[in-house]
Amino acid sequence: MYAQITYFYRRKMSLINDFLSLIYPRQCSACNRLLYAHETHLCNLCAVSLPRSGFEGQRNNELELIFAGRVPVEAATSFLLFEKTGRVQQVLHKIKYHGDKDLAQELGKMYGRELAGQASLGELHMIIPVPLHPKKLKERGFNQSEAFA
């Protein structure tokens, strides 16, 4: 009996979501293509083709050199390469200025899956978010790097 109720509930929710997609189509946060049912925030093409930094496990990478002498850092890396007017900028703007916390969490999960397969990371145990200035936190309502981490 429980299985039948669950089936009908899922079917009903699927129909409701399909109807809502006609009125409010879900779009990729990077390229604005329509999303398939199994895609959440990014289409599969963007999920695999957003430009990665490739800094993982690389000593004295560009990001570490930026921090050198300013703050004590054991290692630094980044997930994506930012280019003005690029798809990464569009994604980051949706997170920062449109409050898309779910998108930040999705990117964090993507990065976590990629990091899990990296043997060269050694003793990496956590990702630490960059603190956000209280004024910016009040403006945006959340720390986007914390949602990512």
Predicted segment positions?
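Glycine-rich phosphate/pyrophosphate-handling loop used in enzymes and phosphotransfer proteins
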Residues: 1-149
